[in-house]
Amino acid sequence: MTWEYKVSTGILSHNGKLIAYCYSGAGESKDKPNCEHIRNKGPIPRGVYFIAGWNNHKSPAAIILEPIAGTNTFGRDHFEIHGDKKGQPPGTASAGCIIMNGQDKRQTIYDSGDTILVVR
């Protein structure tokens, strides 16, 4: 089955079940699909992504997302699902990544075994 993230609402779901409210993008571009082309400001571009693994670079249990062929990323890259950054105001950590707080929730994504995320 698949994971789904809806940019305009911030809803992350798995097989139709609400998992978390998230955000993507920064400032005036946050959660606005029509800003997906703006580097370091717009939300993650709509398309299909492979859940490729995890790392602890941006936050514990950050999920690595790789676009699948046919997904237009507008030359943008290094998308992840990670948490807000410590020492910064909440809601300001995204330069295009999906921000979902709660390491346990991110671990659930990875542990699910489902490796497809559809961004709408």
Label the model's feature ranges.
Residues 1-77:
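Gly/Pro-biased beta-strand-loop elements
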Residues 48, 53-120:
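Exported/periplasmic cell-wall-interacting domains
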